[in-house]
Regions:
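N-terminal helix-loop segment corresponding to the beta1-alpha1 unit
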Residues: 1-192, 216, 276, 287-288
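Active-site-adjacent beta-strand anchor residues
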Residues: 29-30, 104, 198, 241-243
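Glycine-rich beta-alpha junction loops
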Residues: 57, 135-138, 200-206, 236, ...
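Conserved Rossmann-fold dehydrogenase catalytic segment
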Residues: 160-167, 188-204, 218-226, 264-266
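Generic secondary-structure signature for well-ordered alpha-helical cores
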Residues: 182-193, 203, 257, 282
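Non-catalytic terminal extensions of PLP-dependent enzymes
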Residues: 190, 208-211
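Short, surface-exposed loop/helix-turn segments at secondary-structure junctions
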Residues: 213-220, 256
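Aromatic-enriched alpha-helical interface/lid elements that frame and gate functional surfaces
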Residues: 227-304
């Protein structure tokens, strides 16, 4: 009964190893779906030598999002093994003897069943670092959840609409790659491996901080209250303008022929400012606005729809 085998031919082929600050660092991942592979790809881009062991059935992402899977596994050496079998465990531990960082995304209880709890790992591999991606920190790591539930908890969902992207997963991936670098730095200082937990719910809460501070509320300076930091309609689409700093705001006022009152300065929160800019942008095409932005160094981006 074969329990460890090579990856299918459809697996992405390793690309030339990049150079970077993590050159020489060996990372092994047994993490599936999105956060782990995204973190692994970031580490590869920073120069780490990355390897991944998947179950014989493969990573679910390979089946429902083949292009995303391919993008996230460029430069990663992928193999497969059933970690619930003796042969699979042998494959894993052979790889761990040549690993600096192990990346996981299982619940703590599942890791312990596989013999990969931190106590057991650290005893067997004193120099190994582990980055454990979990849903929520501490005991809550055993509670079922996913990107959507963590985003809802962080206040990043509205009404019945689905979010435009996976903030918790991708934020967690960045946090995991950051944790891997911190683990390597600490090991360099102490000579010992260390364990770091990365919770997707914590990543979602971090990304939601501007909202919790009120920055993105309708009354917030980057939530639409500042007339120079909004999305407007133009003749053939939309335009996102981010003239927030005083020098950018002044340039926008100049090109829109909006002058300050004789006494005082322009009030960018006043409704009249939004009306004037609405009229200005409505009179221009995307091409003309792109030209205006280029010639006046304005932070502006046009959209077709």
């Amino acid at each position: 009964m074969p329990t460890a085998k090579s990856s299918p031919k459809s697996a992405p082929k390793p690309s030339p190893q990049p150079t970077g600050p993590l050159k020489g660092v060996r990372v092994l991942s047994i993490s599936l779906n999105l956060p782990g592979p995204a973190a692994l790809q970031r580490l590869h881009q920073l120069g780490a030598r990355c390897q991944k062991i998947e179950p014989p059935s493969g990573d679910p992402m390979r089946h429902f999002l083949p292009q995303a899977y391919a993008d996230l596994h460029q430069g990663v050496r992928v193999s497969s093994a059933d970690l619930k079998t003796a042969a699979g465990q042998a494959t894993l531990h052979k790889a761990l003897t040549q690993t600096d960082v192990l990346l996981t995304s299982f619940r703590p209880s599942a890791l312990r069943k596989l013999g990969l709890g931190w106590t057991a790992l650290h005893k067997r591999y004193p120099h190994l670092c582990q980055i454990a991606i979990v849903g929520a920190p501490g005991e809550a790591a055993e509670i079922a959840g996913h990107d959507l539930t963590y985003m809802a908890e962080a206040g990043l969902t509205q009404n019945l609409e689905m979010p435009p992207t996976l903030f918790a997963d991708m934020g967690g991936a960045l946090a995991a790659s950051e944790a891997a670098m911190a683990a390597i730095i600490q090991r360099t200082r102490t000579g010992k491996g260390n364990h770091r937990e990365v919770a997707l719910s914590t990543a979602a809460l971090f990304l939601g901080l501007p909202k919790s501070w009120g920055l993105t509320s309708p009354q917030g300076v980057v939530g639409g209250a500042h007339a120079g930091y909004r999305i407007y309609a133009c003749q053939d689409g939309r335009v996102a303008v981010a003239a927030l700093e005083p020098h950018f705001a002044q340039r926008l006022a100049d090109v829109a022929a909006i002058k300050a009152p004789k006494e005082g300065a322009l009030d960018w929160r006043a409704p009249i400012m939004r009306k004037r800019l609405t009229r200005f942008f409505a009179g221009h095409t995307r091409a003309s606005l792109d030209a205006i932005a280029a010639s006046n160094d304005l932070p502006l981006h046009t959209l077709a729809n």
